Structures are given as structure tokens and as C-alpha cells.
Amino acid sequence: MKLLLRGHDDRYAVEQLQLALFPEEPMEPVAEPFSGDGAVSSLHTGAVWLTATAEITLHGKTGRSRRRLRTAEADVPTRRRLLQNTYYEAAMCLREPPAWGSLSGVRPTKLTTRALLEGRTPTEAEKLLRTRYHVSPERSRLCVEASEATVQAAQLLRPQDVSVYVGIPFCPTRCAYCSFVSSSIERFSGLLEPYLDALVREIAHTGDLLRASGRTVRTLYIGVGTPTTLSAAQLRRLMEALRTHIDLTELVEYTVEGGRPDTLDAEKLETIASMGCGRMSINPQTMNDAVLARVGRRHTAAQTVAAYEAARAAGYDAVNMDLIAGLPGDDPKSFADSLRQVLALDPENVTVHTLALKKGADLYAGRMELPSADDVAQMLAGAETSLRAAGYTPYYLYRQKYMSGSFENIGWCRPGTAGLYNIYMMEEMHSIVSLGGGAMTKINLPDGRLERFHNPKFPQQYLERIDDVLAQKDAAFRLL
């Protein structure tokens, strides 16, 4: 769909909304008037009034909208909201209202969290989403519930606190839906030991910086690809380095993303637990063996159950399990059965993701038929009903671009078991110091901005540029 801007250059605000509302229409920015299908977003700045108009033509039908506000009241966020609401209203002449209304960002809970922290009631925060951003009552409720968990988690934070993330960008094989930069052990097993050598250097260097800056580590998360691709001995080496070089005495949460059940055995799970980790994530994605095979996950539902039982025997305080709605070959009945099997295991956390088709994933090429948006909506609605009935509540929520049906990912927890790192990271509540290939350190600045520092994505690049990685850590800590 063509997009022409007149009187403003806030292309990002309008483009993101257009992608969310018309995901099946290819985006084509233009600089000149056009005929046929497309959208025009205009802004006229007068002495008294700031007037936004939008006109969208699609398949021979046209939707129009016009809004205005006083020029003196038009700061940048208000102007952006004016443009988006005008575009949204024009679009609603051509399609049914989406559940997320005019919101196009990945962190809708930031709005409700801010409202609660400013002293608004949950009812007032819900009303904000419904009236200002056209969000459905159901999604507004989910946002507020997740934000209430965020407010509770914020009470555990102190000004000197940070979280530490450690990335292990290796997996047994690549799943068809995955776009993470992760190297298959089948091809790159020779890089594991050199990668650990470099990572231990970064850990030691970061430990020195943490001590010098007076920062304390509140949560620690080991993730990215499949950390349990490492052997038990390699996991012990990694976690011993963390314990040796970084002060973990004030840690309130330690998580390892076990991920693929076929990489987990009793020895690894016992090793990880013995090193102080209390949270383990075991991610079946589905309990349907045929769907698992179709997306390239070389494990079975039975292996998931075995890994879970081994984790329980190892004594973890909390176990999370992930499911994905919208996988090829899945349907509402099969998805409901997967959730039923997961709930029968009684994990503390269940995270329900919606399939997001990203350019790096094999599924993006479109060679597999996917469930319809209606089927995915049925999966998610059924999951919410079942999880609430089992005593779970939402504790974090985020959206992704290119997600099936423009839905969301939701972390559900039993009382008192919310994943703190997930909240702190997703809500950007404090600085995240990240180590390893593909890791991104985020420094929260006093003025509310974030400064990002990216490590090289691929393991080989990370090895070759480890000196640059350490120098970049120095630069990041100068901002802390």
C-alpha cells in the first residue's frame, strides 16, 4: 500500500500503524501524489489549530478522518497520537476494529504501568487504553493485570541494581519459526570451547566494572539460543565463572533457559541447580509430536515430560514452560490438548507465545500453511480461560511485529512466582548488562532515554572482536 505524508515527516508513527492494520498490504512510501490504492496522512499547522487528516483507499473503497487540537497543546507525543488516531479512524471505515486498537508498539503495558505508578486506579488505567487508544476491554484488562505485577516487581528494585543477561547462541538444530542468530551444533560444535574462553573474559571484565561502579546484580538470566546445548562440564565452567567474578550475594532470581527438552538430562539439571540457579525454562512449544516434527524440533512430548520430572527432582523453585499458538499443522483442538498436558505437570509459569513470522525464519518463505487468524484467536482465548481456571494470572505481556493476527505473548504465573527478569527487561525498568554473542546491553539514562550497546551477532565474530567487546563494556559503564 502506498503511503504519502503531507505537512509532517513522522513516517514511523504512521507506517507502524499501517503495518499493524493492513499487514497483508506491502508498504510503499511515495513522495508524489498517486492514484489507486494507498493512504495519505496530512498535518496542517495553523496559528490556533493543528489539523490532521487521513484518507485511505483500498480495493475501491475510501475511508476518511479529520481531527484537530490546539497548536499550543501539541507536543511531540500528542502530535503523534493525533496522526495515529486520525489514521486509525480512517482505517476503521475499511476493516473491523483490531483488539489492540491504534497501538502498534511492542510494549503496550508501559502505558498502564505508568498510569498505575502515577496513582491512577486499575479501572482508570483500563479506561485510558479503551478511550485514547481504542483497545478492546479484554486486552485492556490483560495489560492492567500485567502492569499490577510490574508495580509489585518494581518494589524490589534499588537505585544501584542491574540485571545481567548471558547469551549462548548455539542450538542443537534450527527450528523453522526461529529468527534468532543461533548456530547449529551440528555445524559449529568446534566453536563452543573458544566461545566459552571469550565469554569468561567478558564475565571477568564485567565483574570488575560492576564492583568499581558500585552496582549490584538483582537478576541473572542465561539464554538466547539453547544454553543447555553446552555439556554439564561446560555449564559448570560458565556458572563457576559467573559466581567467581560477579558478586551474586544480592541476587533475587537466577534463571537458565533450558529450552529444548532434548538437551536436558538429570546431570545437566543437577549441575545447574547446584550452582545456585532456582528457575528453569523447559519449552515444548507444542505437545503434538507431528507439529514438533514439522517445525524441525527433534524431540517428543515424552521427552518434555521426562525433562520436567528431572527438573523437579533437581529441586528448582520454579519451572516455566512455553507454548506457541499458530504453528503449522496445529489447530485449536491440538493446541488446547498441548496446554492441558502442560497444566497437568503443574509448572509455576506458562508462557503463551503467538507465532511471529520474521525474515530470518525458514517459515517466512511461506512454504507451510499456517492456522488462520481466527484459529489463533480461538487458541489464545481458550488458553486464557484454562490458565485462569487453573489459578494463573498474567505477569508480563508484549507484542511483536509480523505476529500472527497481531496478537501478543503473555507470561502467566501462579501467585508469587512471576519471572522478575522478564518484567525488568520487557518494561525497561533498569539497566540490563548483557554478555555474549548477539547480546545487547541497555543502559537506562537519568533523562529516561536508553543507550544500547550491541555485541557482535555471530560466535566467530564475537571471538575475533572480543577486545572491542570489552572496550564497549567500558563505554557502557561510564554511563552507569
Kindly give the residue locations of the regions a language model identified.
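Canonical Radical SAM [4Fe-4S] cluster-binding loop centered on the CxxxCxxC motif
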Residues: 161-196
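Beta-strand scaffold of nucleotide-dependent catalytic cores
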Residues: 167, 281, 349-353, 423, ...
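A C-terminal junction/extension of Radical SAM enzymes
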Residues: 29-40, 360-435
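N-terminal [4Fe-4S]-dependent radical SAM core
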Residues: 90-97, 117-164, 213
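Short beta-strand motif preference
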Residues: 52-54, 166, 280-282
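Radical SAM enzyme core and accessory elements
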Residues: 1-120, 199, 415-480
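Key residue(s) within conserved catalytic/signature motifs
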Residues: 10, 145-146, 214, 256
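Conserved non-cysteine loop/helix-boundary elements of the Radical SAM core domain that shape
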Residues: 182-383
